[in-house]
C-alpha cells in the first residue's frame, strides 16, 4: 500500500480555502447584521411615534401636533422602505432559483 508523502500535500492551499469560506460567511453575516440593525431602527422609530402620540393625548406640553405628524411620516416611510427592500430580496431570490444550472 502506497501512502502519499505529507510534503507533497499543499497545506497552504487548504488553509487559504478555509480562510475564503470564513470571509464569505463574514460577508453574509455582515448583510444579516445590517438588515437586523435596519429593522431595529424601524422598530425604534415606530415606538417613538407611539410614545409621542400617547404623550400628546395626555396633554404634555413638550409635544406638538407638528412633531406627531413628522414622526408618523417617518415611520410610514421607513415601513415602506422595509417593504420595498423585502420585495427586492424576494424577487432576487426567485430569479436565482429560476436559473438553470
Swiss-Prot record:
What is the protein's name according to its record?
Flagellar hook-basal body complex protein FliE
Q: Main location per UniProt?
A: other
> What PANTHER family does the entry give?
FLAGELLAR HOOK-BASAL BODY COMPLEX PROTEIN FLIE (PTHR34653:SF1), PTHR34653
InterPro entries hit by this protein? FliE
Family label: Belongs to the FliE family.
Location in the cell reads: Bacterial flagellum basal body
Q: Name one GO molecular function term.
A: structural molecule activity
Q: Does the keyword Magnesium apply?
A: no
NCBIfam families (UniProt xref): fliE
Please provide the record's keywords in A-Z order.
Bacterial flagellum
In its UniProt entry, the species of origin is given as Buchnera aphidicola subsp. Schizaphis graminum (strain Sg)
Keyword set includes Kinase: no
- What Gene Ontology cellular-component terms does the record carry? bacterial-type flagellum basal body
Give the record's GO biological process terms: bacterial-type flagellum-dependent cell motility
